[in-house]
Amino acid sequence: MISVTLLCVVIISYFHYNQLPIYNLDLALKFINNSTQKEDFKSIAEKLGYSSDDKLLVIHADDLGLEESVNSTSFESLKKNTVSSASVIMTTDNTDEVANFSDLNPSLDLGVHLTVTSEWNIHKWGGILHDKDIPSLLNNKNHFYWNKRKFTKYTNIDQLYNELQAQVDLAISMGMNISHIDSHE
């Protein structure tokens, strides 16, 4: 059985390479299986009732879970509809707040903010998995590397795969209704 993370990475890469929109997993799979042609795609604007020429602005709240102030400000903006969507860093200590908010707001456009770096001076985090299971992703303090250069130099692809899958699995196990996946940094 193919995992959610691997499937998303393959589909997103394929669609990005072919410059195709990705907003519907069933449609994506049909296209990959050659049962749907590019001409059958409607833009997100068209699916929302706008014309194909209309431009839409999506305002996205990044880094939910980082700290209480980020969560409360983002929650307020989501409630007021000044922010359209958000994504949560699953490797922080404040994800319970996001899970509770998600439970109270089931129509929330909430994604997992896949995280494998820890660039903040004040906020440091490691992975969801135990340190011994992802040593290539961590520095000598068991935090993710602070920059992408070290991350790409030392990372073991199997450990990376397992950590990303664990982040998605944790969000689902906490009852978050995940609509998308994006990445930190």
Regions found by a protein language model. Give the residues of each.
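N-terminal pre-catalytic segment of deacetylase/amide-hydrolase enzymes
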Residues: 3-58, 69
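Acidic (Asp/Glu)-rich catalytic clusters
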Residues: 48-49, 74-80, 95-109, 127-139, ...
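Structural preference for beta-strand elements that scaffold enzyme active sites
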Residues: 56-58, 83-87, 107-113, 178-182
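Active-site beta-loop-alpha junctions enriched in small/polar residues
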Residues: 64, 91, 113-119, 184
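A short alpha/beta connector and helix-capping loop motif
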Residues: 68-93
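Aromatic/hydrophobic pocket-lining residues that form the small-molecule binding cavity
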Residues: 70-71, 95, 160, 164
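Substrate-binding cleft of extracellular glycoside hydrolase catalytic domains
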Residues: 107-164
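Catalytic domains of cell-wall/extracellular-matrix polysaccharide-remodeling enzymes
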Residues: 156-185
